């Protein structure tokens, strides 16, 4: 069985891979994410590769997947809010405006350590939100562990007027880009998905 290791503790990335029927292991990587002032695409790719490399030494053979998401609006990075007040401030800035979500993805092949890395960029437009709506959403707790203080696949989707680009990217892992990175590493992800999908009885 081909070994795939996800170097991330993100439940969203785990759920997306599981939705494909892939078999994989999770080995979270502890990486400092303070890269303020850098180009957002470079930041996303660098963090993704650092996560994958932090785990690579523990994997003898297989592919290690690292990913990191960056929310960028008008020259400012919006990470995970430190509390309800910061979450409300982020949502106040996002409402009625457009921002960018970039996800860096790195795939390292072991044992030779060959790495490929790329990123996906999606533009997201929020509708106008009232102060009451922002307070309500923050009170649900959903924004508190999310970059940009929202989850498009959850209640946060109620406030998204539209996107330009990959929806999976905003969730946390751009699947079309991931498929391309697997091909660059000499692995056809479609074959892995097809085998596991059939054997698990999915229809």
From Swiss-Prot:
GO biological process, one term: nucleotide metabolic process
Active-site residues per Swiss-Prot or TrEMBL entry: 68
Taxonomy, superkingdom: Bacteria
Catalyzed reactions per annotation: a ribonucleoside 5'-triphosphate + H2O = a ribonucleoside 5'-phosphate + diphosphate + H(+); a 2'-deoxyribonucleoside 5'-triphosphate + H2O = a 2'-deoxyribonucleoside 5'-phosphate + diphosphate + H(+)
Keywords for this protein: Cytoplasm, Hydrolase, Nucleotide metabolism
MF GO annotations: nucleoside triphosphate diphosphatase activity
Family membership noted in the UniProt record: Belongs to the Maf family.
UniProt name for this protein: Nucleoside triphosphate pyrophosphatase
């Amino acid at each position: 069985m081909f070994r795939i290791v996800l170097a991330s503790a993100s439940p969203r990335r785990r759920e997306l891979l599981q939705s494909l029927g892939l078999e994989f292991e999770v080995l979270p990587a502890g990486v400092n994410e303070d890269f303020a002032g850098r180009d957002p695409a470079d930041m996303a790719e660098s963090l993704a590769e650092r996560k994958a490399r932090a785990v690579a030494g523990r994997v003898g053979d297989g592919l290690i997947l690292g990913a990191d998401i960056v929310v960028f609006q008008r020259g400012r990075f919006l990470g995970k809010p430190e509390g309800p007040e910061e979450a409300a401030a982020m949502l106040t800035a996002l409402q009625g405006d457009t921002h960018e979500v970039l996800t860096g993805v790195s795939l390292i092949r072991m044992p030779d350590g060959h790495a490929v890395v790329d990123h996906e960029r999606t533009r997201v437009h929020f509708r106008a939100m009232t102060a009451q709506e922002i307070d309500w959403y923050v009170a649900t707790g959903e924004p508190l562990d999310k970059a940009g203080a929202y989850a498009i696949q959850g209640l946060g989707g109620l406030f998204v007027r539209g996107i330009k680009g990959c929806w999976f990217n905003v969730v946390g892992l751009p699947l079309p880009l991931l498929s391309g990175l697997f091909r660059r590493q000499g692995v056809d992800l479609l074959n892995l998905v097809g085998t596991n999908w059939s054997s698990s009885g999915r229809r």
